[in-house]
């Protein structure tokens, strides 16, 4: 029995270390909607004190703590339905994007677990979105510059063609007048 208990404690420690070393903010709610597990990244992402999550609060209490950064009740209601509604149509993976009041972009995904539990993972993708936006802006600027260059070359080509045609005409005329 002692070896079973030691093995159990070891597995719990491995699980906790694994969760705490994830970049993603992870929470697990049981079928009754109570918080069962979370990692440090979750508390950091939502700017929560660890003692706020210590007594296994229910989903609504956790949302109340997170609402200072993200206020859209419709999204929280959608996530809650994935956590607390046992119906098979709600026990499915879902995902979305949040834009928080502190200008961060967070993606979220829900994943049903055995025994009615639900895992929710949040990831701060602000930096990636900023890079994506910068690359799109740069691409648009390069396309606009290329268009301007093409228009300029066409215009210069036309402007040069007209005088050259005239000069060629005079040259042919002069050559035809030579004895």
What are these regions (language model features)?
Residues 1-9, 113-144, 149:
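Sensory coupling linkers of modular signal transduction proteins
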Residues 1-15, 84-95:
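PAS-family sensory modules
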Residues 13, 19-32, 44, 99, ...:
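Long compositionally biased, domain-poor regions of proteins
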Residues 16, 20, 137-176:
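Primarily the dimerization/phosphotransfer
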Residues 27, 31-90:
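PAS-family sensory domains
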Residues 65-130:
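PAS-family sensory/regulatory modules and their coupling/dimerization elements
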């Amino acid at each position: 029995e002692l070896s079973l208990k030691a093995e159990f404690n070891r597995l719990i420690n491995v699980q906790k270390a694994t969760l705490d070393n994830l970049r993603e903010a992870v929470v697990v709610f049981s079928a009754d909607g109570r918080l069962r597990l979370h990692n440090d990244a979750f508390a950091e992402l939502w700017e929560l004190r660890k003692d706020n999550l210590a007594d296994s609060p229910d989903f609504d209490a956790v949302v109340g703590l997170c609402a200072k950064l993200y206020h859209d009740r419709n999204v929280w209601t959608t996530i809650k339905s994935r956590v607390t509604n046992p119906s098979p149509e709600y026990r499915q993976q879902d995902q979305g994007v949040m834009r928080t009041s502190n200008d961060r972009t967070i993606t979220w995904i829900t994943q049903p677990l055995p025994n009615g539990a639900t895992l929710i993972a949040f990831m701060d993708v602000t930096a990636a979105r900023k890079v994506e936006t910068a690359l799109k802006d740069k691409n648009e600027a390069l396309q606009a510059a290329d268009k301007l260059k093409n228009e300029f070359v066409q215009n210069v080509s036309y402007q040069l063609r007209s005088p050259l045609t005239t000069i060629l005409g005079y040259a042919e005329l002069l050559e035809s007048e030579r004895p």
